[in-house]
C-alpha cells in the first residue's frame, strides 16, 4: 500500500468516527460548491487532512475536533463551524464543553466571532434535541 492509499484508508476510519451515522462532511459528495465544481480537489483535500494530518498519533480525534472548532470560531468559519460542532459532539465533547470553548474564545478571537459561534452551536444543539 502506498502512502496515498494509506491516507485514504485512514480517512475512511476518521470519517467513521466523525460521522457514525454515515453522513457526509461538508466538502464531500456535493456538500459545498468546491465539491461540486472541483470534486477531485475536494476529495484530495479531505484525504490529506483527514487521512494524513488526522492520522498522526500525537493527538487523538477528540482533541483534533475541538482544535478545529476553535480554529473555525477564530476565523468565523461559517457553515463549516456547524459541521465541526456536530463532529465534536460525535467524538465525545458535551454541549456544555463546546459552549465553554466558545465563551473562552470570546476574549481571544472577538465577541462577534463568538456570537456567531453561539448561533452555530444553538442550531446544531436544536437539530439534535440537546
Predicted regions and their residues:
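Acidic, glycine/proline-rich low-complexity segments that act as flexible tails and inter-domain linkers
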Residues: 1-61, 115-130
Amino acid at each position: 500500500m502506498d502512502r496515498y492509499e494509506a491516507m485514504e484508508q485512514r480517512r475512511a476510519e476518521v470519517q467513521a468516527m466523525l460521522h457514525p451515522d454515515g453522513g457526509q462532511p461538508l466538502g464531500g459528495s456535493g456538500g459545498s460548491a468546491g465539491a461540486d465544481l472541483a470534486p477531485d480537489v475536494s476529495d484530495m483535500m479531505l484525504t490529506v487532512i483527514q487521512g494524513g494530518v488526522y492520522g498522526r498519533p500525537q493527538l487523538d480525534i477528540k482533541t483534533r475536533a475541538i482544535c478545529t472548532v476553535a480554529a473555525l470560531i477564530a476565523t468565523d468559519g461559517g457553515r463549516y463551524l456547524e459541521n465541526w460542532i456536530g463532529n465534536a459532539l460525535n467524538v465525545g465533547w458535551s454541549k456544555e464543553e463546546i459552549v465553554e470553548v466558545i465563551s473562552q474564545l470570546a476574549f481571544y478571537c472577538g465577541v462577534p466571532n463568538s456570537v456567531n459561534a453561539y448561533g452555530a452551536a444553538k442550531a446544531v444543539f436544536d437539530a439534535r434535541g440537546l
